[in-house]
Amino acid sequence: MTRPAPTRRRFLAAAGLTAAGTTLGAAALTACAATDQGAKSNSTQTPAAAAPAGGGGPAVEPPVTTGAQALQRLAEGNARFVSDQAGHADEGTERRVAVSQAQHPFATVLGCVDSRVPIELVFDRGLGDLVVVRSAGEVLDRSVTGSLEFGVAELGTPLLLVLGHQRCGAVDATIKALDAKHPEADGDIDYLVEALRPAVQQVAGRSGDRLTNAIHANVDLVLAQLRKSTVIGPLEKSGKLELAGAYYELDTGKVVIS
């Protein structure tokens, strides 16, 4: 007997989600929630940041309901990080208890696996604030894209940020592999090289630092791919979701929004 293919509804049920009355793009449900959250629209959801913080930051922050507000909150957190004023908010016992039954993050961030770019620290955020997905060079596959779709559609974040970074090793390795005329790499690393090849080729002959140019080009290409998603694209067109690219400077700690 052939087992039925897994559907989106089955996945949500298996994850412990309560989907009654919920529509795609309006869901603010969490896979960890034990209580029924009901249907919430993007414009009315109460983000995680509104729960009491358990660290050095403000006890209560105003709700985030738009991509612009989410970007502003990330920018403020990064400014604290750069100036060594990080409050390490949303990390203590009070916060942990507050988010134990439900999560309402305000941004979904795709970043690289580089150990020098810990996304929550870079933006001075804590428990329940961000949906973070990481892959080498921000390379997309079905798992990565599906995770991002989950963040924006089911958890209802109004912002999807793609974060590249200075001296990305994955992009640098791709450049070296292509220059050596034998781009094949060991194991599934070859998959990364092939995925990053278009960004490297796109900047061939361009003035400036080749690696930096390719990193920026890769962020743009990833954003273009995400806009083709049948989940992400319509959310952006409807105004419920904002997509943005950014570049993290290893030397300064600063995040520059594209």
Ranges and model annotations:
Residues M1-T23, A27:
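N-terminal secretory signal peptides and thylakoid transit peptides that target proteins
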Residues L12-A13, A33-H104, G128, G137-G146, ...:
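Divalent-metal-activated hydrolytic enzyme cores
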Residues L110-C112, R134, L161-H165, A244-E249:
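Short beta-strand segments
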Residues V113-E138, S143:
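Active-site cofactor/substrate anionic-group-binding motifs, chiefly glycine-
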Residues S115-R116, Q166-A170:
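Gly/Ser/Thr-rich loops at beta-strand to alpha-helix junctions
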Residues I119-E120, V171-A173:
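Short glycine-/acidic-enriched loop or helix-start segments at secondary-structure transitions
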